[in-house]
Amino acid sequence: MSRIVEPPTQRQGARRVWSDSRGRIWVAEWNSGNLSMHDPALGMGANSWRTWKAPGADPHVYAVYVDDQDIVWAAEWSNNAMLRFDPGSEKFAVIPMPRPAANIRQILGRPGEVWLPESGTEFISVIKTG
């Protein structure tokens, strides 16, 4: 059986989702420039969602990944950067990409590493986290 989970931000343009160790679902929102989190343990209503505006001018968040330490990583296209979001402090760190127009569409990793395939440059970047 499937069900509809409706984010509270109108026309948010969800692109990618990832879950953390607590079962929360993190959502990259392209149109709104938000990083959102849905906690199914809180039900399906608006109070089960939290939203943070990505830093930078006119942000567009495309991909999201949660690492083994529950740090949330997001690809932000308008400012050609990776965002490191700490859910505990609710703070973003901005990591500029080394090449213009990296256009990261998916993020993966393994313990201590975040892998970033750059569709705009045909390179793969790796951020060491450990």
Locate the predicted segments by residue:
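Long terminal segments
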Residues: 107, 117-120, 124-129
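Short loop/turn segments that connect beta-strands within beta-propeller blades
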Residues: 39-44, 86-90, 128-130
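A short beta-strand motif characteristic of beta-propeller blades
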Residues: 2-7, 48-54, 91-96
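Conserved beta-strand positions in repeat-built beta-propeller and related beta-rich domains
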Residues: 25-31, 72-78, 116-120
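Beta-rich, blade/repeat-based domains predominating
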Residues: 8-24, 56-69, 100-112, 121
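Ankyrin-repeat and related helical/solenoid repeat scaffolds used for protein-protein interactions
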Residues: 65-114
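Intrinsically disordered, low-complexity linker/propeptide segments enriched in Ser/Thr/Gly/Pro
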Residues: 1-7, 26, 35, 39-41, ...
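A short loop-to-beta-strand structural motif that recurs across blades of beta-propeller domains
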Residues: 34-37, 81-83, 123-125
